[in-house]
């Protein structure tokens, strides 16, 4: 599925887990968001994303990983020309795109009731 600055492909799903391949286009910025029902583990496959995890920004490199706990505010940014590819493993009770609370989004998808 292609959604503006990113695309994703569901690779494998099991009971309470989902594996995706994420692609973040050059200069792409995803929503600043959190999830109530899942944690995520990201493995960087290509590129150098800047990850926001709560209030900290961290640059990651190929073959590095980062854990995003349930409830943590997070974002992926790609300030470079090369597409970022990430293997995302979601674990939790609800693994749907509806489990997203957005705080910032360049496409206007923040709902006032969500971000408070």
Feature map (PLM): residue ranges:
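Conserved small/polar residues in nucleotide/adenosyl-binding loops
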Residues: 1-5
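A short hydrophobic beta-strand segment most commonly corresponding to one strand
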Residues: 41, 81-102
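Glycine- and acidic-residue-biased ligand/ion/polar-headgroup-sensing regions
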Residues: 37-50, 54-55
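Short beta-strand His + acidic residue motifs that chelate non-heme Fe in jelly-roll/DSBH
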Residues: 31-33, 51-52, 68, 74-80, ...
């Amino acid at each position: 599925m292609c959604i503006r600055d990113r695309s994703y492909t569901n690779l494998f799903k099991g009971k309470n887990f989902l594996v995706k391949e994420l692609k973040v286009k050059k200069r792409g910025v995803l929503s600043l968001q959190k999830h109530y029902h899942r944690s995520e583990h990201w493995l960087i496959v290509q590129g150098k994303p800047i990850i926001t995890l709560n209030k900290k920004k961290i640059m990651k490199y190929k073959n590095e990983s980062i854990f995003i706990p349930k409830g943590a505010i997070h974002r992926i940014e790609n300030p470079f020309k090369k597409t970022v590819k990430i293997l995302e493993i979601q674990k939790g009770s609800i693994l749907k795109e509806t489990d997203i609370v957005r705080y910032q989004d360049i496409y206007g998808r923040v709902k006032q009731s969500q971000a408070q």
